[in-house]
């Protein structure tokens, strides 16, 4: 049976405090399940990525268990819906470590939550893989247990800025983010980086993702002379309202920015399909097809593998493949002999690279940003095909 679409949009998160919890556990009985905690926003306004990741998580666990598990151990996914709330994420993390006795944790799925729980997991020594992009979430001295499976926001920001300045060849930039911890941090960094590279940031603001009327912000951006609008938000609802407002204003300006601008959720939120034109979202080589309509061979292999089992049409391919890769990275560590939390972390530090479907990840004891920068590209947001996208104009 296919994992079906759940119609949610993205949006809020805030930073919350953390509490001290227990120490890591080590040797496990051979027949004991391999318990992987999964911190996910599966409902609420920030749920679209979590839903996509969840499909990959479930498919990975089902596939591994159908093949006999890992060294005879069944994969058990311990899922907690955080609803994008850092406080709920903190409580779930403590439960997973202290009560559920998980062996590793995948997630959470947004940076506001991760800011709250990363120190907790570090104190407990729990192996953690996450897709959260705020640069400071990876620090091998403070958080030697934390590994990033997705690019950092710095890598995303570099791709967006390069596309705006070198391909679109614009100089007057408007930058808009939501009011989450992620949105505020991303806008601040983006403004500084554009200015550093000689661009004129004519307008910037953080707005509530639930704000219904985007006309005031769009009007200010146009009045300031913006030639492109850069968006940093995971809220597909907010993004769709911005696209619809652009059309209502008869303003032919480009959008560039966050990968969620290409989410299948947006299609149903648009007043007209053409409102999605001239929107360029961060993408990845592994999730992009060329003018011939073909994906890279390994990516096509995954599409074929999940056909009829996992829906890709209303989500992003990278969300599904990253979820799949994360579970397999835990399983691979155990398969290779890791018998403790410390062993799993030590094994991940030797991956040079790990051949996943989303990317080929390279980690060392000194570097836990594993995604290759060269594989971060821009995509035409409205060109989705099985959650993959046409490379944006200007790429060879």
Regions found by a protein language model. Give the residues of each.
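N-terminal secretory signal peptides and thylakoid transit peptides that target proteins
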Residues: 1-16
